[in-house]
């Protein structure tokens, strides 16, 4: 089992960001359950870049917590590339405060949530959302964090 992470820090203030070791711990709690090898990029950005990408790819005129861009290999070409996660520092920090969650736990949740998207999970339909949230809760609790959806239940 191996995960190759390309970590890109593209925000002005790096204070308080999770370490590469923490990111790898969270990725290793998720990805190896689905595939033994993976390469992915995590890019931590400011609101401006998140806003631009969210507008361009999702038609939403605001920054968002995490964007997932799965890699789709051409037919017949097998690569371990999972894709890219773009995580907005300010949105994650604001949501942690609003939801009264420890900041590190919310970062972990965004990595788990985004990784599941890269692995093909979605939450557009209610049954898909239920399955994905249940898996996120199980993975988060397995790492010693609380249920990330406890406030909504």
UniProtKB/Swiss-Prot annotation:
Entry superkingdom? Bacteria
Under PROSITE patterns, the record lists: UPF0054
Q: Which UniProt keywords apply?
A: Cytoplasm, Endonuclease, Hydrolase, Metal-binding, Nuclease, Ribosome biogenesis, rRNA processing, Zinc
Named cofactor requirement(s):
Zn(2+)
The EC code for this enzyme is 3.1.-.-
Q: Where in the cell is it found?
A: Cytoplasm
Single GO biological process annotation from the record: rRNA processing
On cofactor binding, the record's note says: Binds 1 zinc ion.
Q: Which amino acid positions bind Zn(2+), per UniProt?
A: 113, 117, 123
One example of the protein's molecular function in GO is: RNA endonuclease activity
Give one Pfam family, short name only. Answer: YbeY
Question: One GO CC term of this entry?
Answer: cytoplasm
Protein family: Belongs to the endoribonuclease YbeY family.
Q: Which PANTHER family does the protein's record reference?
A: ENDORIBONUCLEASE YBEY, CHLOROPLASTIC (PTHR46986:SF1)
Task of the protein = Single strand-specific metallo-endoribonuclease involved in late-stage 70S ribosome quality control and in maturation of the 3' terminus of the 16S rRNA.
The molecule here is called Endoribonuclease YbeY
Which lineage?
Bacteria, Pseudomonadati, Pseudomonadota, Gammaproteobacteria, Vibrionales
């Amino acid at each position: 089992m191996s995960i190759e992470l390309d970590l890109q820090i593209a925000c002005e203030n790096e204070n308080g960001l999770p370490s590469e070791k923490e990111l790898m711990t969270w990725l290793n709690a998720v990805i190896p359950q689905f595939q033994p090898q993976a390469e992915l990029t995590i890019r931590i950005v400011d609101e401006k870049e998140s806003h631009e990408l969210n507008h361009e790819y999702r038609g939403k005129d605001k920054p968002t917590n995490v964007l997932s861009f799965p890699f789709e290999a051409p037919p017949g070409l097998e690569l371990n590339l999972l894709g890219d996660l773009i995580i907005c520092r300010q949105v994650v920090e604001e949501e942690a405060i609003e939801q009264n969650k420890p900041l590190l736990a919310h970062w972990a949740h965004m990595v788990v949530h985004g990784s599941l998207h890269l692995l093909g999970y979605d939450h557009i339909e209610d049954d898909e959302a239920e399955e994905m949230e249940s898996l996120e809760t199980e993975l988060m609790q397995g790492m010693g964090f609380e249920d990330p959806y406890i406030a909504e239940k």
